[in-house]
């Protein structure tokens, strides 16, 4: 069993001296890959039950579970390790196993016993109360206990920064994060700290690193997170890359796109909230989003709205609409509209917002006045302590909801997903 690893992670793979291991860093640094490898190596040697946690259970399948599945195959362990997809579980011939749970289904955590190892992936997305609950689930009569937490850095208002580094309001200091960025690996009390960036992943292509560098030009906050791997103070604007341009210029740009993807989304309203419909176009190669048409009205009954939007019944353009209103969708369908409900799930509000933020530019026609009014200054809501709430805003942006729905099944290339940071023997190393 031979596996290439990145040198910056060699020490981490076999160091189990501390109870907590906190890995923070930029995109493509191979954090998750090496955590998964570390756990597999541990469970091959010792009979343990490991619990892998994400905030939303369903996100495991294409992330952590997929990663373990690939590792087992790459390491040629299929004869002693079995990956079961329903329910997701990894079983070892020595009795070890890895189980996967989500904090969105807390009741399923209550039946778990004898957990000696927990990995919280994307721990910044888990609530602090959830973290403390997991500490209570980490118990075993004989084996040493370990918790691994991995994340990209977010704002300094996130609990991960306050718990593992410093909380100025509570006058609590654990470690200076700037010292970690300089030294890269630090052991403090019972916590092993590890910092990494894309530069530590020798298996990444230069083109990927260049994409991260380009973030500096259009999203400084994301550059700090993705390229530098640093915590910091997030700007309050949700879409700093949003810009307004003359309608003719927008339409010309769309006409020049190589195979543009065009979509329509609708958010329902009535009295105080608005019916918002947007037409958007995506330049997949440039990662540009164009918004070139809008409808924005309230106080109308469904029949009046259908009459005003009758062009869609004629063109049969597919409209992705708010699935929370199945009766309204059915009404429009009965009146000739090609309308379906968009995918919504627990946590989708945050995930859809993150998706839209991944566009390099969001270019809006100056004719879409309500979209501009809502999105250009759109800011995050804050709690009573002034901390940003990532899935809440200072207003209810109906046009943003319409964009979410329009693009529900389209994925902006995520710089984190473009390279999973998983060393492959067949891939040439980056020099």
Curated annotation (Swiss-Prot):
Keywords: Viral genome packaging, Viral release from host cell. It comes from the Bacteria. InterPro entries: P-loop_NTPase, Phage_terminase_lsu, Terminase_L_C, Terminase_L_N, Viral_DNA_packaging_terminase. To B.subtilis XtmB and phage SPP1 terminase large subunit. Dimer of a small and a large subunit. May function as a terminase. This is Uncharacterized protein YqaT.
């Amino acid at each position: 069993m031979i596996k290439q690893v990145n040198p910056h992670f060699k020490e981490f793979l076999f160091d189990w001296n501390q109870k907590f291991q906190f890995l923070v860093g930029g995109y493509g640094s191979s954090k998750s890959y090496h955590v998964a490898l570390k756990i597999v190596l541990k469970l091959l040697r010792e009979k343990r039950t490991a619990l892998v946690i994400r905030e939303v259970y369903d996100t495991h399948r294409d992330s952590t579970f997929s990663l373990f599945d690939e590792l087992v195959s790459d390491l040629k362990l299929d004869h002693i390790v079995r990956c079961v997809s329903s329910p997701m579980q990894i079983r070892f011939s020595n009795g070890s196993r890895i189980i996967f749970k989500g904090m969105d289904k807390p009741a399923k955590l209550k039946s778990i016993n004898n957990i000696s190892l927990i990995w919280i992936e994307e721990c910044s997305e888990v609530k602090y109360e959830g973290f403390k609950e997991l500490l209570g689930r980490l118990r075993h009569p004989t084996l040493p206990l370990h918790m691994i937490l991995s994340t990209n850095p977010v704002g300094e208002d996130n609990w991960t920064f306050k718990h593992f580094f410093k909380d100025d309001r509570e006058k609590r200091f654990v470690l200076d994060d700037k010292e970690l960025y300089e030294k890269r690996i630090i052991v403090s009390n019972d916590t092993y700290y590890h910092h990494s960036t894309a530069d530590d992943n020798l298996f990444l292509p230069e083109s990927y690193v260049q994409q991260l560098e380009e973030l500096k030009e259009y999203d400084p906050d994301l550059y700090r997170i993705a390229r530098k791997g640093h915590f910091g103070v997030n700007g309050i604007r949700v879409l700093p890359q949003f810009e307004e341009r003359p309608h003719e210029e927008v339409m010309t740009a769309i006409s020049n796109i190589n195979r543009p993807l065009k979509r329509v989304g609708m958010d329902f309203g009535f009295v105080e909230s608005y019916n918002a419909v947007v037409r958007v176009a995506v330049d997949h190669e440039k990662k540009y989003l164009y918004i070139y048409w809008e409808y924005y009205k309230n106080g109308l009954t469904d029949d009046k709205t259908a009459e005003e939007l009758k062009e869609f019944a004629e063109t049969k353009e597919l409209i992705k609409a708010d699935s929370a209103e199945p009766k309204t969708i059915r009404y429009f369908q009965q009146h000739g509209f090609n309308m379906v409900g968009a995918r919504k799930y627990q946590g989708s509000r945050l995930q859809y917002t993150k998706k839209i933020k991944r566009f390099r530019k969001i270019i809006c026609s100056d004719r879409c006045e309500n979209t501009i009014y809502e999105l250009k200054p759109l800011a995050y809501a804050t709690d009573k302590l002034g901390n940003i709430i990532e899935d809440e805003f200072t207003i209810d942006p109906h046009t943003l909801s319409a964009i979410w729905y329009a693009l529900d099944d389209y994925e902006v290339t995520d710089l984190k997903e473009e390279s999973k940071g998983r060393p492959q023997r067949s891939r040439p190393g980056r020099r």
